[in-house]
Amino acid sequence: DLEELEKVKASLPVRNWSAQYMQDPTSEEGAIIKREWWNSWEGKIPKLKHVIQSYDTAYSKKETADYSAITTWGVFTPYEDQGDALMLLDAVRGKFDFPELKLVALDSYKYWEPESVIIEAKATGVPLAQEFRRMGIPVVDFMPSRGKDKHSRVNAVAPVFESGQVYYPKDEKFAEEVIEECAAFPHGENDDYVDTMTQA
């Protein structure tokens, strides 16, 4: 039954769930950002130099609507002899109406206290940015350049991943979901996390 399936889903890595139960193994073929380019980080979150939060918001919570997504990234130095790298700190996705989105966004903001907040200037992102500014939170509006489609934006950030500069906390389900979505792009079912990543 559905409850049992939900339990199985919660216990399996996202990749196994997609392959076994959804009959939809995430293929690496054609992937712009490959799974093996991500580095896992064990232990507690390192000292961060800068925290960035990126928002891709949808129009509504209708079944047919896209998801709203928030990812949080930290800039840090993994090892003394290395330059700066990025760490995926958190990822939240859901179908929210505006009041819910505002609460989720504020919770995430208060928890991570990012220095930079980037919100795509579309859909519920516009009023959300206004609300944040009203509270004294500085927001950067993200406007995709004309002629720069999603594909181009992902291609632009791919070298950062390929050069081994992106980390994720080991054994975190949200990290698995983001990695899987990236590996499935551009053929995956969702790309909301991918959108937030290219903005950050």
What is the predicted function of each stretch?
Residues Y21, V157, T196:
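A residue-level signal for conserved active-site and pocket-lining positions in enzyme catalytic cores
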Residues Y55-S68:
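An active-site-proximal beta-strand-loop segment
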Residues T57, A121, D192-T196:
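Generic detector of well-ordered alpha-helical packing
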Residues D1-T57:
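ATPase catalytic-site recognition across NTP-hydrolyzing enzymes
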Residues G43, L48-H50, G74-T77, V126:
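Catalytic phosphate/metal-binding cores of nucleic-acid and nucleotide-processing enzymes, i.e., regions
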Residues Q53-S54, T71-T72, I118, D195:
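Structured core elements
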Residues E3-K7, D24-I32, A69, F76-F185:
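Mg2+-dependent endonuclease catalytic cores in nucleic-acid-processing enzymes, primarily RNase H-like
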Residues P186-A200:
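Charge-patterned, long linear interaction tracts outside catalytic cores
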